[in-house]
């Protein structure tokens, strides 16, 4: 049962004036503006030199997100830094152990050993303290 039959009222219609011609003109202006901007961009692009790593270009060409590449790169660098830090700390501990053992074995060279270790950025352990091997 319709509303107009039960209430006795006639339905109201809203009408919109379709302005085809102005809409087409606006679209034409937008397309022309877009084309002009693309022409400007293509003319200025050769003058701008941006070095993009080929790996990122390959990611984009393979429809992959370059942010993923950046995240993976940062994670790899962090792992390598941790590994190198561990190696550096191990070498410092080895240097300290060798310096300590040399000071015990050749006490008359204590000053020379300390200078050599300190010159390379290391710290000489105090004589008399045993270090864990």
UniProtKB/Swiss-Prot annotation:
Pfam families: Med10
Domain of life: Eukaryota
GO cellular component: mediator complex
Biased composition (Polar residues): 1-13
Disulfide bonds, paired cysteine numbers: none
Location relative to the cell: Nucleus
InterPro entries reported in the protein's UniProt record: Mediator_Med10
Single GO MF descriptor: transcription coregulator activity
Biased composition (Basic and acidic residues): 15-28
Keywords noted in UniProt: Activator, Nucleus, Transcription, Transcription regulation
Stretches the record annotates as Disordered: 1-28
Principal subcellular localisation of the protein: nucleus
KW Nucleus (keyword) present: yes
One Gene Ontology term from the biological process aspect of the record: regulation of transcription by RNA polymerase II
Quaternary structure annotation from Swiss-Prot or TrEMBL: Component of the Mediator complex.
Family per similarity comment: Belongs to the Mediator complex subunit 10 family.
Function: Component of the Mediator complex, a coactivator involved in the regulated transcription of nearly all RNA polymerase II-dependent genes. Mediator functions as a bridge to convey information from gene-specific regulatory proteins to the basal RNA polymerase II transcription machinery. Mediator is recruited to promoters by direct interactions with regulatory proteins and serves as a scaffold for the assembly of a functional preinitiation complex with RNA polymerase II and the general transcription factors.
UniProt protein name: Mediator of RNA polymerase II transcription subunit 10
Organism of provenance: Phaeosphaeria nodorum (strain SN15 / ATCC MYA-4574 / FGSC 10173)
Gene name linked to the record: NUT2
């Amino acid at each position: 049962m319709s509303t107009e039959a039960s209430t006795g009222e006639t339905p109201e219609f809203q009408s919109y004036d379709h302005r085809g011609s102005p809409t087409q003109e606006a679209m034409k202006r937008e397309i022309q503006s877009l084309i002009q901007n693309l022409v400007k961009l293509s003319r200025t692009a050769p003058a701008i030199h941006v070095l993009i790593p080929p790996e990122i270009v390959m990611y984009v060409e393979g429809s992959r997100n370059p942010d993923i590449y950046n995240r993976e790169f940062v994670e790899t660098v962090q792992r390598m830094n941790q590994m190198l830090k561990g190696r550096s700390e191990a070498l410092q501990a080895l240097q300290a152990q060798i310096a300590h053992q040399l000071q015990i074995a050749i006490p008359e060279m204590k000053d020379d050993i300390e200078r050599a270790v300190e010159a390379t950025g290391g710290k000489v352990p105090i004589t008399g303290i045993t270090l864990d091997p």
